[in-house]
């Protein structure tokens, strides 16, 4: 933010504008329109494949391992949303039968699938693979596929799952050792898993990788499933590109690139985030609302972080709290642009939701936005005063400025199943939401620390931690990493039945945590610098279709 505060806006203010790179995409997505003939052709071919897949799923008399493998393959191929009821019923039956297995592969796959679907299966299933000292048997080292599944299972652990801490360490060491000597496609699958475990990955990104890099190359592949998955991916991609074209036109009409040149132009990356929250066709309206919200709050973030003066930001904060277009005259010209755009956007949301009698829920998102802006203003005050708060004070403010309370709430707007009671539950910051927010905060803080430090910000999470605990930068980052691990256990716990809201409404909260893991992988700021991280994902999901 600018450090000079003046009473007269006519006076020239020297602003330390952050030098953000322009959009990588230009007008690339602006003019896409669905080829209805191709879309209809894909949809017609999908129907019989879908029914064949359903028949495979509900067939009886299969071995446990074959049933689990089929479900896992369908989920990894990104087509399980067609069969949620069938899969849940099968897993419910398996769980209630106390199904067990003697081999590592089946046990680990059983454990992960049940946990990911909310069934609290005991980690004691793994005790048979330990020796008398409680260590995993070295004889397992040669079972690479079993180890890979043990590794993936270890990431759904909760606080009560100490055995899975050992499982993670054991499987990681042996997979790293085995990886260079494996044949394709297992080699690629192991290398990818070590880089990005399945449970913390963005579902569409994982699906794209699995179809193209793994399943197509597997000798044992099922051609019905593969064909179905490719057609479904390409058909959904058309819908996603159409949504992005709509949002790109909205963004271009706002013309923030010209009128607010200090801010990041990242509407495509914002769409990737919304797509990470939910990709299924029934959430089209929800996605468009969410991407517009993320794009808008990004502008507000940069206004506080890289442009506004203290006095301007205080006035802007007050105007947002009042939420009244008549407040606009108090603002400097550049702030009038975003203020009007924000109020217009929420009027549009109310209008859009009114036909379903849901316009009243928009107020929940507005209150969350007011909260974010209040907390942005606190951060800007700390910056100008050179104040470094204790870690606890820092976090009490900084959790809201992740925008994740706000985005989780916004993600429910276009979800037709979300009721007033669900919004009330979310407004109380339940533990699972708190966990997702903490994951975002500490991963973001670690990745952006050096850049924020170079811009003179001392009230960063890492700096506050270093001072509070008298530790080095690396030790502070390790503490933050440990906070993320603890939060993941809380989040995983929050997915276990019985849950206060439906699994459908918990999934966006989980996916928000996944997105931040992917965007800031290897401590890179993939949002500010998308060329480093997000560009290949965006190309894979929104530019290149899968060859049929």
From Swiss-Prot:
Per UniProt, subunit arrangement is: Monomer.
Pfam families assigned: Terpene_synth, Terpene_synth_C
Keyword check for Magnesium: yes
Alphabetic keyword roster: Cytoplasm, Lyase, Magnesium, Metal-binding, Plant defense
* Reactions catalysed: (2E,6E)-farnesyl diphosphate = (+)-5-epi-aristolochene + diphosphate
Q: What does this protein do?
A: Catalyzes the cyclization of trans,trans-farnesyl diphosphate (FPP) to the bicyclic intermediate 5-epi-aristolochene, initial step in the conversion of FPP to the sesquiterpenoid antifungal phytoalexin capsidiol. Produces germacrene A as an enzyme-bound intermediate that is not released by the enzyme, but is further cyclized to produce the bicyclic 5-epi-aristolochene.
Disulfide bridge map? none
Q: Into which family does the record put it?
A: Belongs to the terpene synthase family.
Q: Which residues form a coiled coil?
A: none
Q: What is this protein called?
A: Probable 5-epi-aristolochene synthase 4
Subcellular localization(s) per the UniProt record: Cytoplasm
Q: CDD domains, per this entry?
A: Terpene_cyclase_plant_C1
Domain notes per entry: The Asp-Asp-Xaa-Xaa-Asp/Glu (DDXXD/E) motif is important for the catalytic activity, presumably through binding to Mg(2+).
Q: What do the Gene Ontology cellular component annotations say?
A: cytoplasm
Q: What superkingdom does the record give?
A: Eukaryota
Q: Which cofactor does it need?
A: Mg(2+)
Top-level EC class as recorded in UniProt = lyase
- Would you kindly state one Gene Ontology biological process term found in this protein's UniProt entry? diterpenoid biosynthetic process
């Amino acid at each position: 933010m600018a450090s000079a505060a003046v009473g007269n806006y006519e006076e020239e203010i020297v602003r330390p504008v952050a030098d953000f790179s322009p959009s990588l995409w230009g007008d690339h997505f602006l003019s896409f329109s669905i080829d209805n003939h191709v879309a209809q052709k894909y949809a017609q071919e999908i129907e019989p494949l879908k029914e064949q897949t359903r028949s495979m799923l509900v067939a009886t008399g299969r071995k446990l391992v074959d049933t689990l493998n089929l479900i896992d393959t369908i989920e990894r191929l990104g087509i399980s949303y067609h069969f949620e009821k069938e899969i849940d019923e099968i897993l419910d039956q398996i769980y209630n039968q106390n199904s067990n297995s003697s081999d590592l592969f089946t046990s680990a796959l059983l454990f992960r699938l049940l946990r990911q679907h909310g069934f609290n299966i005991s980690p004691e299933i793994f005790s048979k693979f330990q020796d008398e000292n409680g260590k995993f048997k070295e004889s397992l080292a040669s079972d690479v596929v079993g180890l890979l599944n043990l590794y993936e299972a270890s990431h759904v652990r909760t606080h009560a799952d100490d055995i899975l801490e050992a499982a993670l360490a054991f499987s990681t060491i042996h997979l790293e050792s085995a990886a260079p000597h494996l044949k394709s496609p297992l080699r690629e699958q192991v290398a990818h898993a070590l880089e990005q475990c399945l449970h913390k990955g963005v579902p569409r990104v994982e699906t794209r990788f699995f179809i193209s890099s793994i399943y197509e190359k597997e000798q044992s592949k099922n051609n019905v499933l593969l064909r179905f998955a490719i057609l479904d991916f390409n058909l959904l991609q058309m819908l996603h590109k159409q949504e992005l074209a709509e949002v790109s036109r909205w963004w271009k009409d706002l013309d923030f690139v010209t009128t607010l040149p200090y801010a990041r132009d990242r509407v495509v990356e914002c769409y990737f985030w919304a797509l990470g929250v939910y990709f299924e066709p029934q959430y089209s309206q929800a996605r468009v609302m969410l991407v517009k919200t993320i794009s808008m709050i990004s502008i507000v973030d940069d206004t506080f972080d890289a442009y506004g003066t203290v006095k301007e930001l205080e006035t802007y904060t007050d105007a947002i709290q009042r939420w009244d277009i008549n407040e606009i005259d108090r603002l400097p010209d550049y702030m009038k642009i975003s203020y009007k755009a924000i109020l217009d956007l929420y009027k549009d949301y109310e209008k859009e939701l009114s036909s379903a009698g849901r316009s009243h829920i928009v107020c929940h998102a507005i209150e969350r936005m007011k909260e974010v802006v209040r907390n942005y203003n606190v951060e800007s005050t700390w910056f100008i005063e050179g104040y470094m708060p204790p870690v606890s004070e820092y976090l009490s403010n900084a959790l809201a400025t992740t925008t994740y309370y706000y985005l989780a709430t916004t993600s429910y707007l276009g979800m037709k199943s979300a009721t007033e009671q669900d919004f009330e539950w979310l407004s109380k910051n339940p533990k699972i939401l708190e966990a997702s927010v903490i994951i975002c905060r500490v991963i973001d803080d670690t990745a952006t620390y050096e850049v924020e430090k170079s811009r003179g910000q001392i009230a960063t999470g890492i700096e506050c931690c270093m001072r509070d605990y008298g530790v080095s930068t690396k030790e502070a980052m390790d503490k933050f990493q440990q906070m993320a691990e603890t939060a993941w256990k809380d989040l995983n716990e929050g997915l276990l039945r019985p849950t206060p809201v439906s699994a459908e409404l918990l999934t966006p909260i989980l996916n928000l945590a996944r997105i931040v893991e992917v965007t800031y992988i290897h401590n890179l700021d993939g949002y500010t610098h998308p060329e480093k991280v997000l560009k290949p994902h965006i190309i894979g999901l929104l530019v290149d279709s899968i060859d049929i």
